[in-house]
């Protein structure tokens, strides 16, 4: 039959253009659109292309500046390997300690980007292509002119550009994800448009590019897409499992918090298994992949024991044990529901107990503040570290306005409709099973476990987002993915038989676009130009008026800038996830307590501090009742409550224990008088 000519009078069949190429083009378009959007917002907000090198570094505030400083170290080192050695034997970040910052701060993104930058500049130099253009910018108002360079040859521009490209590609993944989950390209369109319409609730990469989530989150999207594929597939292929392992590693390596997200995923998958939507073989393979990726991260992070003592690691071990004990569970003569409860309790209490034991055995307390933070959300628990977190808006409960913003763009109503449809399916599936009294009656698995998994993951992200506002950055994008299921024939086939799905989807998108376009316009209207003259004066004074080995202490955000731009040793910094660093910061912040100046000076001398950068605003500012620094110290040090805060006294007169050596409208540098 092959090669047979078509019958007379009938034209030859037209070659069929597959849906895949069209889908790929749309995914690429979504990627380019998001890259352009976040690049435009970042430039509009900072006028980054016209800033000097120092201004660009100051624009990376708090922990952003800390992370970027290690990229700068490797880029400016005599060789790449020398730069890596320097960050692995760092003497500036927690003086006088020598620490492996690659192990402590999840700096693989900076290592990789620095290597790419060095390769890029060498190749461009070799073939004679100019990589940056520099010019002099006149600032006016009596300020000195500055040199500003633009192009990928500038380290800061290269660093930011790669981050934006990665997050542009993430939007292509969202289109593919929504398409695959819903079974319709319309689903991919819904996901992408929901993300854009709720952009300010979905990401902050355009305002804070160097944060760990900017590197890590795109790989979580890929990882969840792979999990969806594995749950849906009738046959597991080795390639899918290897891809899942790699995406796990790429998600965990840049971000310490990744383990908590993966904990919610493992818990959701375990629940999906318990109620019968995936078989034991599939879950066991997923657990093995997670264990392998965790072990790889442990090795690549130079034996970072915080990974092994995490709730995530404990949960993996407990679930593996439950799966191994399945024959014993089936021998228990109880109802199906009772068996679910038994396995759930075994997982919950087993995970908590194993986590406690491993932390005690390894002597790890680095993540103790996470438990205290969660405790403070439900009870009246307070301590110094917890208050530093909860007094910051991003660690407070979700704003009351957030659900309203979701509702205005119709994201919340659409997701609720999808969620209710999934719950109806679950109830329908479970009805017959729960009516039985014995556990051995069910011989088959339910269909569409990936839908149940996404519903459970939505609940987990909702809990995280409500408890800690910053974590809505997981919730909102997942809601956008869930919204794609409004196009799913598995859930709404009964409706699509009566009404064309395109008509329903485009009607919903048209309604969404009313508030969505207003949200986008609000973002586009943000126009600013970065300037921080007081900090610029401070950095310039430090660079030219202090010795290269002078040791500084002060507020965490300022210390990151001192290390990055002045290259001076510091004793504390914004990466607060280490128990030792939290203890150091408490000593440094005692300057804002009501303790005696002599006592504070004595502790600073023990840390070998030469200069303290005092900021009066830290003494008086108050984000909400009980959140000024003196009030936080009243919880930690009630014996001195009622006394005048030390910072207020030192603002007026720093003698005799300190000497004022520099002062401007924001900063006052105190030299510690040695005894």
Curated annotation (Swiss-Prot):
Catalytic activity: L-tryptophyl-[protein] + a di-trans,poly-cis-dolichyl beta-D-mannosyl phosphate = C-alpha-D-mannosyl-L-tryptophyl-[protein] + a di-trans,poly-cis-dolichyl phosphate + H(+)
Pfam families: Dpy19
Tree of life domain: Eukaryota
GO molecular function, one term: mannosyltransferase activity
Alphabetical UniProt keywords: Endoplasmic reticulum, Glycosyltransferase, Membrane, Transferase, Transmembrane, Transmembrane helix
Gene Ontology annotations for the cellular component aspect, listed alphabetically: endoplasmic reticulum membrane; membrane
Organs and tissues of expression: Widely expressed.
Keyword Cell inner membrane: no
Compartment(s) of residence: Endoplasmic reticulum membrane
Region (Disordered): 1-22
Protein name: Protein C-mannosyl-transferase DPY19L1
């Amino acid at each position: 039959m092959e090669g047979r000519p078509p019958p007379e009078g009938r034209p030859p069949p037209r070659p069929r253009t597959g849906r895949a190429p069209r889908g790929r083009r749309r995914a690429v378009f979504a990627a380019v659109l998001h890259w352009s959007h976040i690049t435009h917002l970042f430039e509009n907000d900072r006028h980054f292309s016209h800033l000097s090198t120092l201004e660009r570094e100051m624009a990376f505030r708090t922990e952003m500046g800390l992370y970027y400083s290690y990229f700068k170290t490797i880029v400016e080192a005599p060789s790449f390997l020398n730069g890596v050695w320097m960050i692995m034997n760092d003497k500036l970040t927690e003086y006088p300690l020598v620490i492996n910052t690659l192990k402590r701060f999840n700096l693989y993104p900076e290592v990789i980007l620095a290597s790419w930058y060095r390769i890029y500049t060498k190749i461009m130099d070799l073939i004679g292509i100019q990589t940056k253009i520099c010019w002099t910018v006149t600032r006016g108002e009596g300020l000195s002119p500055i040199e500003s360079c633009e192009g990928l040859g500038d380290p800061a521009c290269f660093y930011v550009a790669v981050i934006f490209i990665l997050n542009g590609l993430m939007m292509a993944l969202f289109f593919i994800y929504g398409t695959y989950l819903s079974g319709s390209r319309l689903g991919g369109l819904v996901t992408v448009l929901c993300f854009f319409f709720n952009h300010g609730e979905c990401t902050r990469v355009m305002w804070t590019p160097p944060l760990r989530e900017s590197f890590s989150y795109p790989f979580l999207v890929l990882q969840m897409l792979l999990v969806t594929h594995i749950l849906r597939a009738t046959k597991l292929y080795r390639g899918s499992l290897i891809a899942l392992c790699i995406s796990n590693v790429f998600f965990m390596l840049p971000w310490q918090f990744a383990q908590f997200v993966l904990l919610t995923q493992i818990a959701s998958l375990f629940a999906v298994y318990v109620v019968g939507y995936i078989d034991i073989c599939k879950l066991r393979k997923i657990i093995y992949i997670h264990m392998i990726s965790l072990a790889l991260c442990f090795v690549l992070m130079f034996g970072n024991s915080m990974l092994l003592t995490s709730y995530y690691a404990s949960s993996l071990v407990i679930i593996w044990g439950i799966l191994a004990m399945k024959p014993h569970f089936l021998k228990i003569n109880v109802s199906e529901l009772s068996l679910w409860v038994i396995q759930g309790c075994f997982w919950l209490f087993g995970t908590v107990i194993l986590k406690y034991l491993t932390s005690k055995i390894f002597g790890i307390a680095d993540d103790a503040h996470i438990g205290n933070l969660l405790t403070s959300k439900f009870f009246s628990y307070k301590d110094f570290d917890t208050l530093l977190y909860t007094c910051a808006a991003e660690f407070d409960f979700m704003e009351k306005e957030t659900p309203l913003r979701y509702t205005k763009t119709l994201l919340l109503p659409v997701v609720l409709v999808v969620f209710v449809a999934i719950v109806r399916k679950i109830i329908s599936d479970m009805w017959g099973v729960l009516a039985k009294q014995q556990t051995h009656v069910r011989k088959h698995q339910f269909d569409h476990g990936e839908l149940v998994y996404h519903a459970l993951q939505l609940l987990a992200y909702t809990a995280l987002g409500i408890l800690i506002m910053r974590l809505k950055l997981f919730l909102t994008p997942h809601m956008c993915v869930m919204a794609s299921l409004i196009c799913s024939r598995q859930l709404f086939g009964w409706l699509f038989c009566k009404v064309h799905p395109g008509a329903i989807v485009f009607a919903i998108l048209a309604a969404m676009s009313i508030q969505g376009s207003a949200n986008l316009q609000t973002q586009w209207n943000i126009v600013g130009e970065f300037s921080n003259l007081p900090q610029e004066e401070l950095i310039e004074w430090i660079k030219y008026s202090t010795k290269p080995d002078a040791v500084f202490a002060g507020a965490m955000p300022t210390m990151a800038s001192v290390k990055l731009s002045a290259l001076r040793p510091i004793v504390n910094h914004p990466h607060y996830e280490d128990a030792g660093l939290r203890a150091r910061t408490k000593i440094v912040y005692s300057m804002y307590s009501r303790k005696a100046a002599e006592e504070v000076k004595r502790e600073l001398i023990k840390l070998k501090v030469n200069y303290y950068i005092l900021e009066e605003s830290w003494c008086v500012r108050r984000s909400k009742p009980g959140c000024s620094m003196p009030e936080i110290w009243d919880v930690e040090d009630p014996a001195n409550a009622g006394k005048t805060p030390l910072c207020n006294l030192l603002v007026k007169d720093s003698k005799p224990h300190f000497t004022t050596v520099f002062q401007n409208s924001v900063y006052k540098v105190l030299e510690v008088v040695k005894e």
